[in-house]
């Protein structure tokens, strides 16, 4: 059941959007097809209906849509010219500001999207080690739209086997699996690529998700899975790449690496670092990063990132102001608290409806997730779509993932509680009755599937 606006989008744009996570197959059929503005934690559709949003531009907005101070900072840079023939003062200031924030990095290069940044990290690793194999964590959903990653998913069409056979998957929080892969491809591995954390903590002794506490009760300073990964990489002369697109400027200001006490060789950042403005970064140790430089005469060159708009001043200005706003307003702590309140509210309502076995929220509080199970305890995309559908009726965008922002405050949580109470009544009927009766339109689908 495709709407008129979606049909127009599909006619002009392959997939109907510029990232597959925004596709019509990721939302219930009653979801707004298009939006025209956002403010705080809310989006407005083309009919001026207001929706509380838990997608927050695919986690790119951690403060709120259209934050005045950040917008003004970007506009100031536009008025100055936005993009020059050589480097700008803003470019220098942003690089210095970034390196003061991300303590483990000696150099940084900016980009416009995370895919470019992570692929640049992989290229640096291959150049530094003169090795080809990439070990990437299969439990982390996305690293890049480039062939080295997409070829390791179900969607291999258009990618030569010679490329994707060089990417090998390993499991998160399973250090023995990583050891086995390193042993199997001994002296062939350029890098290990993973996110610091997704739905659970990096703990090698157990994998029980997140403890769920506002203040994490686990001690990561002495030992954790990421430390073991780091040690393995060091022992085997493999470049340790930490992709902090989601965790950066969200878990801690200095990234999850600050929280989990690790020092990656290369890190990548993006998403929340400029509150929705297009910017990403690859950063790391000088001895690796400087391979992409040009001043050392006679050294073989590595063609790193080279982008006309990579240092666009409006995005860099927004980045600087975003970090200042985060510091001044204690955004990191607020988002952890907002997410904790979301999880607690979700589970309180589910418990009261007798659904907690089939429907619950969990995860790191600043980036929670929810689980939808059928009466046999099996994950159900149909039930997930029904929940999304019922939340839309209450004017709440409730996507596959939950992205918490600064403005998901007590009022937003109260609105969410009221909506959940109504939505869960339908969900309960769908769990114990004929599920398909309660779904209008089609179920959502996984992004990474071989066929449409």
Give residue spans per PLM region.
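Conserved N-terminal phosphate-binding loop of PLP-dependent enzymes in the Aspartate aminotransferase
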Residues: 1-452
